[in-house]
């Protein structure tokens, strides 16, 4: 068994005395692809920030890439983490290729007088192609669709060859076509990068890629269930997590939600 990429042990986070997370534990290994689900206010964003070394626990321990938060150079640690936030706003008038290249420097814009190496240019082009944007290499960021922006940001996050990829509601604001194109490419990444671990946050089961291997459900800052995806995303667990009776269906690797009782006309 490989060493954990992430190890969260009995973590509590409190702000102004109010608990945001309570007694949460999680272990993620290389090649695992986790979904983090729960209603608004469940603590998903706070947990994701800790996994990305952007926040520290009030109690408990968090190890990211084998390093314990509080005992490591955070800047060096973040170089091994790819973070995809659809709210990210590139600085300046950049093309798709240039936005992806900012992932090499982990900056919002291109650094003055910085020049990408031939290897970095080749990697940026490879990732743009991999994310299905080969026809948009030189397109301006401002004219991209929301779905194209999302895929560009995933390519950007992969530029430093991270061991861990964090996706914060990547399908937010996408129409049906944009969502499906994004999920198709995320699923492809899971096959082309077999050692990459990922954690994807969402409210919606329909936004989970078929390659999802594990899931954690949060409610009111506590774990409802965590483990292998087929054992966690069940009718009983989802109904409890969202405090609403539903039926969970899975077809060809994708999940959907139906009312617990057939609706009467």
Which residue ranges define each predicted feature?
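The feature captures the beta-strand-to-loop junction immediately N-terminal to the Walker
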Residues: 37-39
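Conserved ABC transporter NBD signature motif
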Residues: 60-70, 77
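Conserved ABC ATPase "signature" region
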Residues: 101, 116-136
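Conserved ABC ATPase signature
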Residues: 140-144
